[in-house]
């Protein structure tokens, strides 16, 4: 199994430390790849969003089930999320840039909340939930 995360931008040092800790834990269950897309500096937000979206699409591995993280996506419980992501051989999660992505390119959308989260923090939340999903599937004590 391989989990891929494609995200626009780089993490700051403190968030990176937390992210790396969960990435290390995930390697027990699955390969994990992080693909960071450089944030585009164009002033025109629609052009910026389009360029970032096309860059993301070009990085998605073949035969991968893709989930865009979006406020418009479907909500899952931790148990449902575990079933969703641990039954596929190759999964890619996408976190767009600060101006979003062109969502029509993405069939599957997941929402963790109707709230808006800072991108730095959300990347850590996502990887923690991926780790939690594996602990649920493997009946480990982490999830209560």
UniProtKB/Swiss-Prot annotation:
GO molecular function, a single term: rRNA (pseudouridine-N3-)-methyltransferase activity
Keyword hit for Phosphoprotein: no
Entry keyword set: Cytoplasm, Methyltransferase, rRNA processing, S-adenosyl-L-methionine, Transferase
Gene Ontology cellular-component annotations: cytoplasm
SS bonds (residue pairs): none
Catalytic activity: pseudouridine(1915) in 23S rRNA + S-adenosyl-L-methionine = N(3)-methylpseudouridine(1915) in 23S rRNA + S-adenosyl-L-homocysteine + H(+)
Family: Belongs to the RNA methyltransferase RlmH family.
Oligomeric form and interacting partners: Homodimer.
Protein name: Ribosomal RNA large subunit methyltransferase H
Upper classification of the organism: Bacteria, Bacillati, Mycoplasmatota, Mycoplasmoidales, Metamycoplasmataceae
Gene: rlmH
